[in-house]
């Protein structure tokens, strides 16, 4: 009767409990049944356990008495609906239960504990259980099959919520990403990306087939729960059927060991560590009897799990918390930049932890560049990574201004690869000229970022929108062009696509990179304004020529990359540009030179940490690696105009139409002069019409009318038939090119020929064809695929030894190291244009010595253009290099460009001046000296060595102590007056990589306010004008003058013009100078590409 009462009081056991009892009987010797009263007294209820922040609940059984063999909590139902949150009854908490930790100290044995737990990893191999020979009968199997039927019917009714994630082929049966040996930072299919299905769920919870909190261990080393999601109910049943069928056939359990009374099973739970990449996270468990489990999981393990709280705050709809990643538990809570879970992006660190990797740290951040990329970099590129990392830790941008051909694109691509590898950024925007985008794609593929890159420059609007949405919703690199940015600024701001709440600063783009960033040198253009409207945490400009015409361009670039560094535009003009321009002029006084040098030094020191520039001569000279790059010799060949060219040139300058054009449109007149110097056939009637058609978009109606009259004036004086029959002889440049090729081609040299206009290339092409030379050509009409194909053909070296290119197209981004001779046919107002052309051949990968020929007609407008190039080059070096520069030339007055040479066209004053300056530095090897002598036989006016420019340091004039002290006091006064006008950020890190002068003091602030001494002269002029005007109004006085007041009227006219010129000069900060270079270079690039 008592037994029946006890049976009535005992609750029915669940299916798993019954199954556990059967397996217990199969694997252990029979025991004496314990007294029923023991189990009756310890009867407990099931408890519902809620994981903090998760919707699913886990039903747990408390420990029962030893009669039933339950010594640990068993998870029975993972998918049951929520019924309420209750506390866990911790009866029997004193029993020992091993953790899944690898520590052997936790693997202890206590008498009376069960042989194993029913909590089983169904992705692990089937267990091999000990058995007794007497338990192999058919009766036992029939009972087991009955249990299986019950389990199948039970599981068929269970509600299993399954996320329908699209899984990659890289996942095995357990939902664990396989080891990836291939090194590639891909997007939705690679180890470097966040899987597309994961991006739709919580960002830090991996919802694969097999996921769960691996273990929870209390402070005394006691174990808690092990939670697992299974694939489907069918797979669940099939796994158990296979496991039970193996009962009696296996003697050991591979992959997991359970605590047992035997000495062979004391290893603790082991979760098949060879496959699974889910990290074990230890958490403490309170020992009080009634514990709120949701509060426990949220608070325990504070030393590790709490540090990842920021990564999981938005995971309110997921089932279980999975802390994955090799270093996830080691992450620090203080993170100035974003850091992501290691497994969140499907990224396997072990496949990338190789030798030669670069690791940089700073401000609790860690940057790692895998060795497979790091080993591809030159030493100077590794230094560039250090500089870029210093900017990153400061939250700043900068200008990478390395000399052309030093691999700036590779430096940036490698740095981005390390940032993505280190989980420090999610998105980067790269803006470049369209001709450079294939080169970017190639370099990004080299560092393994090809699958992460999306193109945003095609003609299909829908395709562009799709790629933009893909990047903004996930991660990766977006490639686009300046024109696309200008027309799609709002879309790139990301307001319509962007939903990431992880960004504390609200910036959609972590990095914005501008290749050929000097294209935004004019801050008033829509191009520059649209780029400034796109939010970005870091802005990097890549430009080998950050200063092309004037210092205002430098301010514009830093205003984009480091806003506020140089103040506003007016402040920069008053405190820097004004004094530097005065000091760099050849006619500057000693005092102006010294003040200009002081201000220039301050400017260099101020921008130094944010501006990195290395020259090829420095990079491959200082580190003993000169063998890696060959030698370059640049020579200027001064040519004499042919008789026909000289006649046209003189007639044009002396004509009345030119004088009228001077007052109306000097740009159009300069265009005609340049074309006369290149080739008279450019100015035939048909060519004049072509020029007008191409210039319609850049010239006003008035300017177009002037240009038409000028061009037709020249065309009417040209005998077209005579020109056609004497194509080579009427142009000194074309005649020289053909004579030079007769010497170069037989010797096996390969030649690049650059011109600014397609029309000039056509004339050169006609001469090459008539002389039987094979050649290749690309210009603005060549399509991008054909352009790349042509470049590859030339680099292979089997098609043609001559390559014709326009400066605007061929001067950007191309690598033509197969050539060792470069001819620049016509100079550009912008010196960087010619320099870009030269560096197509002289760059990393060149193994031959390179000779560059810059063709200039002596005593013409081209010579004055070259002088202007040298002047601008000195200005650039003054602002960026720590050396006192030689002052070769002064600012030119506009009238000098239209004046006839005093010494005739056969002598070049510039060539003579440069020879006097550098004659003692000219040291030519035997081969080059012989070649120069050959050039002199071709009837040239002379040769200048362009490579020697700025090779000397300007002498510093000695001054008296009294004068020096006075200048020092005045400078200190100026510093004090301007120091409060702008706030400067403290400079940290990166300075050693930008410049390395010994006399740099980063803490020094030199801010100079202008002293406008023109106010006095302007007031004097106005006073004289007033006095002369009053005198002229006195009719009695004027009547007594011999000339009737004509001289007074002339003086008034001169003073009025002088005052007008002074005010115009003040607006451009170039006193008494009219400078049209900036306007000319802009319009010529658009209008003269014929």
Curated annotation (Swiss-Prot):
Residues 736-895 form the Helicase C-terminal domain. One of its GO terms (molecular function) is hydrolase activity. GO terms for biological process: DNA recombination; positive regulation of mitotic recombination. The keyword Ion transport does not apply. Its main location: nucleus. It comes from the Eukaryota. SUPFAM superfamilies: P-loop containing nucleoside triphosphate hydrolases (SSF52540). A motif (DEAH box) lies at residues 515-518. It is an enzyme of class 3 (hydrolase). Residues 1-51, 247-273 are annotated as: Disordered. It is found in: Nucleus. Residues 256-273 have a biased composition (Basic and acidic residues). ATP binds at residues 402-409. Gene3D superfamilies: P-loop containing nucleotide triphosphate hydrolases, Tandem AAA-ATPase domain. A motif (Nuclear localization signal) lies at residues 44-51. Keywords: ATP-binding, Coiled coil, DNA recombination, DNA-binding, Helicase, Hydrolase, Nucleotide-binding, Nucleus. Belongs to the SNF2/RAD54 helicase family. This is Protein CHROMATIN REMODELING 24.
